Amino acid sequence: MKHSSDICIVGAGISGLTCASHLLDSPACRGLSLRIFDMQQEAGGRIRSKMLDGKASIELGAGRYSPQLHPHFQSAMQHYSQKSEVYPFTQLKFKSHVQQKLKRAMNELSPRLKEHGKESFLQFVSRYQGHDSAVGMIRSMGYDALFLPDISAEMAYDIVGKHPEIQSVTDNDANQWFAAETGFAGLIQGIKAKVKAAGARFSLGYRLLSVRTDGDGYLLQLAGDDGWKLEHRTRHLILAIPPSAMAGLNVDFPEAWSGARYGSLPLFKGFLTYGEPWWLDYKLDDQVLIVDNPLRKIYFKGDKYLFFYTDSEMANYWRGCVAEGEDGYLEQIRTHLASALGIVRERIPQPLAHVHKYWAHGVEFCRDSDIDHPSALSHRDSGIIACSDAYTEHCGWMEGGLLSAREASRLLLQRIAA
């Protein structure tokens, strides 16, 4: 099957949809056809809202934002009349011995960044605290990505200050945090409805297999979920997909785009709801615990549900538990919850319902922090444009997706005008 468009965007996450919105708002695109493809059956990308047990909205993907750190995202929420609620997990009320000393240790090490800030965070902390102490200190922050050799001490301080649970460690308590009252999927639906009303056509459930130049445009080969093959010709092309997806295409990524190196981290989120909110007996409502066991970060949302959130090795650990069977997975959660709370396992009931999500490439980022990286890329020969939060200083956040989309659409509008 063959069809064509003037403009094609591959990727219907927040970046791709925002690109479409910017383009359709411009007089330069008036009268031009626009087609959006995505491998998923629903738009949204890493925004994945879901109802848990028919009672509470949860986020299997992106789950929070800060107006101070993410002003463009806040503006989008307001523009599409999306209601926000306070994200309560911004303080560690219950701290381990190491966590009690964490803020002081980080403050004492901060002046050393000028001299050794380019070292890996583990190497940097080990230099002054010793290896064993450094490992314990970094583990107490709950984000195992901080152990990566690509994460410099300078980057680590920035990361810590931009995550709600541990922002106070670097004196960033003033940052407010919010979630969407009924899920960020509402924002996605709002943007999608706007671009659809403006004439964009969606083809969801199609995976991009390859792309090549074809005269003054591009020829895309795609495959549907049912194996149906599709050939699409377009004059202008934006790939609103992450680096891990770019690397699987025949577009010479990243060599012909930026020359930078990219990496990714797996993420795992598990949500559970119970007949009774048993954690209220321990005064844990709206509290987060960072623990030294495979659960890593445990969040107790009011009297509604609890969830845990892990990255790196522990994300893969939980994926393995799920693969071995649901009963074993739930028993592992129960065991580690009891250990974290210092209670016997029998005090923790079986959940009424649960849901989980493993993201093989949950966070993607540029591994070369010392280069001046554009927020959207253009292929040096073919001119294909690419956008992703991974190309911005807000990698892993929805804000980065919006910034990259803005730059990608600017590049294309500039090209159309010429």
From Swiss-Prot:
Pathway: Pigment biosynthesis; violacein biosynthesis. Binds 1 FAD per subunit. Binds 1 Mg(2+) ion per subunit. It comes from the Bacteria. Its EC number is 1.4.3.23. Substrate binds at R64, H163, Y309. GO terms for molecular function: metal ion binding; oxidoreductase activity. Changing W397Y: Retains 60% of wild-type activity. InterPro entries: Amino_oxidase (IPR002937), FAD/NAD-bd_sf (IPR036188), Zeta_carotene_desat/Oxidored (IPR050464). It catalyses: L-tryptophan + O2 = 2-iminio-3-(indol-3-yl)propanoate + H2O2; 7-chloro-L-tryptophan + O2 = 3-(7-chloroindol-3-yl)-2-iminopropanoate + H2O2. Changing K269 to Q/S: Retains less than 2% of wild-type activity. GO terms for biological process: antibiotic biosynthetic process. Changing V363A: Retains 50% of wild-type activity. Gene3D superfamilies: FAD/NAD(P)-binding domain. Disulfide bonds: none annotated. Its cofactor is FAD; Mg(2+). Keywords: Antibiotic biosynthesis, FAD, Flavoprotein, Magnesium, Metal-binding, Oxidoreductase. Belongs to the flavin monoamine oxidase family. The enzyme generates the imine form of indole 3-pyruvate (IPA) from L-tryptophan (L-Trp), with concomitant two-electron reduction of O(2) to H(2)O(2). This is Flavin-dependent L-tryptophan oxidase VioA. It comes from Chromobacterium violaceum (strain ATCC 12472 / DSM 30191 / JCM 1249 / CCUG 213 / NBRC 12614 / NCIMB 9131 / NCTC 9757 / MK).
